[in-house]
Curated annotation (Swiss-Prot):
Primary location group: cytoplasm
InterPro entries, per database record: Helicase_HTH, YpbB-like
Organism: Bacillus subtilis (strain 168)
Additional detail: The stop codon of ypbB overlaps with the start codon of recS, suggesting they are translationally coupled.
Keywords: Cytoplasm
Subcellular location: Cytoplasm, Nucleoid
Subunit structure: Interacts with RecS and SSB (ssbA); the 6 C-terminal residues of SSB are required for interaction with YpbB.
Protein name, entry field: Protein YpbB
GO cellular component, one term: cytoplasm
Gene3D superfamilies linked to this entry: ATP-dependent DNA helicase RecQ (1.10.10.1390)
Length: 352
């Protein structure tokens, strides 16, 4: 029962969480659940790169992985249900696995995965359509059934009528970008495309062909798509910009949090934002914690003083914990849960 890359992802998350969240938290992270708790945990425990990166996994997939890791003695169950500590042998296996198959450098779920899904559907369909047009073929099954994607590509092709020139531009753009990433990742990306001549390979087919772990192939594929988005700010390619022109690239915050963020920037206090938006004060506090995690320039001193931040951070460091209740009780309940959570957002590099 050897470990696959999915197991390594689970093990790495549990190592970073350090017994402070359950296996269910890993499930929600991998699924990309856009709840305040999951998004905050992703920032607090430095696991945001995994956000949404295994969206099709099931609870049984997580359970099977946890069982496997426990049977190998890489995890030790804790007294609290569904929580685990990574053992010394588990940490050693994790280090070795990540040295052999490191997480791809530009692959970041919280930053890019939502936009990457849109980009891939549009790009892969555009490649397929242009390939068939060049061969004079009108009979084929589109690579996606997604109506929004089908409509977008149809509209785009109707606005740009020189399809031969478009195909050349698309080829040049893909070639230029793929030269800048690892050869294997570029190969995986290219073989995932469907053209007039062949159907794109699945992750399993590519894993068999490349003699590689299927989950690692899957991650490397998405890493190649993420690189296109990562390079967008410096990119001068009109076609790539067009493919993402209407896609919101700042995916770290939930939509509701973005609305709160706009009001915070206008100087509204928490209570007033809650009244205007007809939301609970606790919900607005959740939003502010999210904002603090994902907006480095956001100052929290209006909510918790610099001196109080230091006290909270020093206690958390001394006790090696991010558990809010433990910190609050240890500091004799001088600070609210909100203040402690907020102070910890500025300490997210610690205690991995």
């Amino acid at each position: 029962m050897s470990l696959n890359y999915f197991d390594i992802m689970v093990l790495d998350c549990l190592c970073k969480i350090n017994g402070e969240r359950s296996g269910s938290a890993v499930f929600h992270l991998f699924k990309g659940k856009r709840s305040s708790q999951t998004i905050q945990d992703a920032g607090l425990f430095q696991t945001a790169k995994y956000f949404g990166m295994a969206a099709k996994c099931s609870r049984s997939d997580i359970s099977a992985s946890l069982d496997k890791l426990e049977k190998h003695s890489y995890l030790a169950p804790m007294s609290e249900s569904d929580t685990y500590k990574v053992t010394a042998s588990g940490a050693a296996v994790l280090r070795h696995a990540l040295s052999e198959r490191p997480w791809p450098v530009h692959c970041h779920g919280a930053h890019y995965q939502q936009a990457a899904g849109v980009l891939w559907k549009r790009l892969s369909l555009l490649v397929q359509v242009l390939s068939h047009k060049q061969q004079g073929s009108r009979q084929y099954i589109p690579v996606t059934k997604d109506h929004k994607t089908l409509h977008w590509v149809k509209k785009y092709l109707s606005r740009h009528t020189d399809h031969i020139e478009m195909a050349k531009s698309l080829f040049a753009m893909l070639e230029a970008h793929l030269k800048k990433i690892e050869n294997k990742a570029a190969q995986i990306f290219v073989y995932s495309l469907t053209s007039h001549h062949r159907i794109g390979y699945t992750s399993r087919q590519l894993a068999d062909t490349l003699k590689e772990d299927e989950w690692y192939v899957y991650i490397m594929f998405w890493a190649s798509v993420h690189y296109f988005i990562h390079s967008l700010p410096e990119c001068e390619d009109a076609l790539l910009k067009d493919l993402l022109s209407d896609v919101h690239l700042d995916n770290a915050l939930t939509e509701s949090t973005r609305k709160t963020w706009q009001m915070v920037k206008q100087g509204f206090p928490i209570q007033r934002i809650a009244e205007i938006r007809k939301l609970k004060t606790a919900t607005i506090e959740d939003h502010i914690v999210e904002i603090s995690l994902h907006e480095p320039a956001f100052m929290i001193n209006d909510y918790v003083s610099a001196e109080d931040q230091l006290q909270i951070a020093e206690f958390a460091k001394r006790m090696r914990t991010n558990k809010i209740k433990q910190i609050r009780d240890g500091l004799e309940q001088r600070f609210s849960y909100f203040q402690i959570r907020l102070a910890l957002t500025k300490q997210v590099q610690q205690y991995d």
